[in-house]
Amino acid sequence: MNSLVRRKQVDSVHLIKNDGPHQLAKKLSAVDLVAIGVGTTIGAGVYILVGTVAREHTGPALAVSFFIAGVAAALSACCYAELASRCPSAGSAYHYAYICLGEGIAWLVGWALVLDYTIGGSAIARGITPNLASFFGGLDNLPVFLARQTIPGVGIVVDPCAALLIMIVTILLCFGIKESSTVQAIVTSVNVCTLVFIIVVGGYLACKTGWVGYDLPSGYFPFGLNGILAGSAVVFFSYIGFDTVTSTAEEVKNPQRDLPLGIGIALLICCILYMLLSVVIVGLVPYYSLNPDTPISSAFGDSGMQWAAYILTTGAITALCASLLGSLLAQPRIFMAMARDGLLPAFFSEISPRTQVPVKSTIAIGVLAAALAFFMDVAQLSEMVSVGTLMAFTAVAVCVLVLRYVPPDGVPLSSSSQTLSDTDESRAETENFLVDAIESSDSPLLGNETARDEKYFGKRRKIAAWSIALVCIGVLGLASAASAERLPSFPRFTICGVSAVILLGSLITLGYIDEDEERHNFGHKGGFLCPFVPYLPVLCILINTYLIINIGAGTWIRVLIWLLIGSMIYIFYGRSHSLLNNAVYVPTMTCTRKTTDHLA
């Protein structure tokens, strides 16, 4: 069990000499990060989502749902921004969980992100084929080498176009991060220009017709507050993608400044575009007249602009290509981070000295994603994508609480660790670390006052740790009971009440006690700080947990099977190959001082 809770050093990545050709190249600026964030977030789903949500949940108030969902996504973005600037690593949420929550949860988070990036990338590639076919007059008119074919006898529909697109993107990613980000910026610009075209031209047409979509007897809120909130839960998933930015952290020139900027600006741009698009589309035609499959194309067609369908299709294709590029960009870097920690084979951690990207990992992920897109109809697996991302969002919010109230107070040192090489000198310094740690705690010069302070801080850390654990328990109980509509009223409201008391009591406790002073020594300084702690992270945990619980039972069964497979890999490989095996933990301040001297 100790292996599940062992935590690695926050700066283990940065203590490696990072100026050689075998490290990731620092070439990205804030502008590059914004392009990656916007491109990965704005998928083609928004071209369909507006019609479905407006018809079934919100009516003309669709923009309000997008705003609420944007605020909810911003909560997670704030948590990501703090951790990304404090401990920039290609591992993203996996890395944050490893240094705050332990190896076991970190592995599950990293394994769950495979759902988001690899399976999600395959689903995206499959979605490009029908959009591309519209330029050829339909799927049946595609060239033979691109057309979908059914394998006789087994009924499997293969999609060579999707597989080919994935391999093209994989080759592009192998050329280097700057080349990939440049292409991402170009493709994203085309997509954004398409959305601006829809907003401007659609707004002009709506002005000519008098914004008929808002002049309805049912008013602006035909489905009431419940409809607005239900719509927000659906459109929240259109904001997923900004977290891809954090997987490029080791390739950013100034991560403390640019990572928070990239995350925040990307999310703001997406929110503004979504809201303006919603205002125009539901104003152009009555919400009940929107085509649920092609709402924007149909709205323009009803206004006599059938030719606009080609522009919209171009936008959908570029949106999918940008999302695909972002997915295949992030996954190899997360696997690279896991391999550097010993949890995956070292093959995934190798970096090309010429292009300074994890070429082998990128090719492996590309081949896997291409095979999935070629052979499998991943539509049934697409819902699993959201689970992986929401699990990461939740873990990151918990990490912020841990960082502020119970940051790691020990640093792992061993002959196999990443921080020191296996030499006689290194072993001698490790012994000195232990001696210094013991002497610093037993020195008579510290006196009884220091002992009392240590006792107080130790008690405060225990209270904070239990409060964070009870917050998670309260959130889980409250979200579960609130979602259990088939549960009888009495037990349902009882569980809600008890869970709410646990949640509020723990939250009040966290708000009352002081944050740990060691948080100032955690990671890099001068970056973004998440505001309104502990309230903002707890609200983030509550929202994400509610969304996770409300995902269908069939999807959850598939997710649990996937996590079980990952657990087996960890038990039989990762646990025994972890670099933290037989690690010795010493006080953070002692190690920080000695490590600094060693590096100097």
From Swiss-Prot:
It holds the Pfam family AA_permease_C. GO terms for biological process: amino acid transport. The chain crosses the membrane at residues 33-53, 61-81, 93-115, 153-173, 185-205, 221-241, 265-285, 309-329, 361-381, 383-403, 463-483, 493-513, 529-549, 551-571. Residues 1-32, 82-92, 174-184, 242-264, 330-360, 404-462, 514-528, 572-600 are cytoplasmic. Its main location: membrane. The keyword Transmembrane helix applies. GO terms for cellular component: plant-type vacuole; plant-type vacuole membrane. GO terms for molecular function: transmembrane transporter activity. Expressed in roots, stems, flowers, and leaves. It is a multi-pass membrane protein. Residues 54-60, 116-152, 206-220, 286-308, 382, 484-492, 550 are vacuolar. It is found in: Vacuole membrane. InterPro entries: AA/rel_permease1, CAT_C. Keywords: Amino-acid transport, Membrane, Transmembrane, Transmembrane helix, Transport, Vacuole. Belongs to the amino acid-polyamine-organocation (APC) superfamily. Cationic amino acid transporter (CAT) (TC 2.A.3.3) family. Permease involved in the transport of the cationic amino acids. This is Cationic amino acid transporter 4, vacuolar. It comes from Arabidopsis thaliana (Mouse-ear cress). The lineage of its organism: Eukaryota, Viridiplantae, Streptophyta, Embryophyta, Tracheophyta. The gene is CAT4.
